[in-house]
């Protein structure tokens, strides 16, 4: 079975002297759509902040740290992996937001062909 997803991660990133990039996870929002739906106007989704592992909504297979391997360009101009190493706390301020919409779980070449996900007028509410 295949399904689309909406994912938002808030991270606080830093770079060491060797150009390695690290991040704390400050906020997490992961929504999978397990069934076909009609068009939804003004849909909103909660961002969970800090260490969410004890929350009832937490699902480790889709919300754990380093759930996917993501890359960034460091200060040396090199493409390097982002090492998500810890959960943030109430004192951490995010430096980066990762927002992903995918029509097929697992990305290209893994999901089912023919899936469609329409996204229109995305906005942040804070």
Where are these predicted regions, by residue range?
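Generic "edge-of-domain/loop-turn" microfeature
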Residues: 15, 52-54, 106, 124
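Short beta-strand segments enriched in hydrophobic/aromatic residues
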Residues: 10-12, 49, 101-103, 126
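Extracellular carbohydrate recognition and processing domains
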Residues: 17-90
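Extracellular carbohydrate recognition
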Residues: 73-78, 84-93, 104-126
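Short, surface-exposed beta-strand/loop "edge" segments at domain boundaries and coil↔beta transitions
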Residues: 15-24, 105-112
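Extracellular-facing segments of soluble proteins and assemblies that are Gly/Ser/Thr-biased and enriched
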Residues: 1-20
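One-face residue pattern on beta-strands with alternating periodicity enriched for small/polar residues
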Residues: 5-9, 42-46, 98-100
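Residues that flank catalytic or metal-binding motifs in active/ligand-binding sites
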Residues: 2-6, 41, 113-118
